[in-house]
């Protein structure tokens, strides 16, 4: 197995950085769209281990990447807890009966029953890990981000229902977050048992929170998960909060091994605020891939020059969020080739 990705979490400074892409198995690839067309709905595809493996392999077959990520979705846990999940074209994920009260929370399945409904994810991990020669990244949504969809019922610009519960009924909110955290610990451990070499916790909506509420309603539970996972098995864990650059000082002493960085700050700024000892992952603006070949190469060169100038810390080159579905696959090749060229 190529271990450059895992080596980034070691103490030795690497000669070159590993690279992978958030949502690298996705709609921007025509081969992904061909597989997706075989299934009536997205979750049916997620439940098919062979399909998950096939689409996870697509980017590895096209590009020189140092890691794969299991093909799944962050909302597998809420669905396993008994919530009715549908993916609606033009809207995205929708829960028909969102959490609004303690009564709604009481209707959810137990942790044991919920975990038993997620075997299809572990099967996808096992099938994919046995088919690749690079590390496989497992993942989950953070409790706060999962709760955002479970309470709001769908994505939202303002998440008013979510934030209303946080302020008006914090006890109920914490009850939901704790249950999600307890399930997530087992969920990640099962992914590792099935073949994941590291895990990532995506906190997509943590960035909407004020600092103190981020600490109490989001980071607290991510740290709880990371500590409990590491008590069982010491694997690399990466925290990523979209829009979370204001929280770096709070994250630097937590149990994660790496921190995802979006494009709202430079890697230099992130390193200064997080300090030494954590791997930084990121942080290209996904939209930079709309640019010309020359502009892509120039942007890559600037980031690689900084990475090489830091003699103490390792970096994982990635986008600052998931790749957009209308990106030209050839632009991705330009980016990766430039990363390899300028890292040589």
Swiss-Prot record:
Listed GO CC annotations: cytosol
Enzyme Commission number(s) of this protein: 4.1.1.37
PROSITE patterns linked to this entry: UROD_1 (PS00906), UROD_2 (PS00907)
Catalytic activity: uroporphyrinogen III + 4 H(+) = coproporphyrinogen III + 4 CO2
Pathway this chain belongs to: Porphyrin-containing compound metabolism; protoporphyrin-IX biosynthesis; coproporphyrinogen-III from 5-aminolevulinate: step 4/4
UniProt keyword annotation of Lyase present: yes
GO molecular function, one term: uroporphyrinogen decarboxylase activity
UniProt keyword terms in alphabetical order: Cytoplasm, Decarboxylase, Lyase, Porphyrin biosynthesis
Site residues, Transition state stabilizer: 73
Classification via Pfam families: URO-D
One GO process term, biological-process aspect: protoporphyrinogen IX biosynthetic process
Highest taxon of source: Bacteria
Binding-site positions, substrate: 23-27, 73, 149, 204, 321
Family stated for the protein in its record: Belongs to the uroporphyrinogen decarboxylase family.
SUBUNIT field: Homodimer.
Stated role: Catalyzes the decarboxylation of four acetate groups of uroporphyrinogen-III to yield coproporphyrinogen-III.
Protein name: Uroporphyrinogen decarboxylase
Organism: Francisella tularensis subsp. mediasiatica (strain FSC147)
Gene: hemE
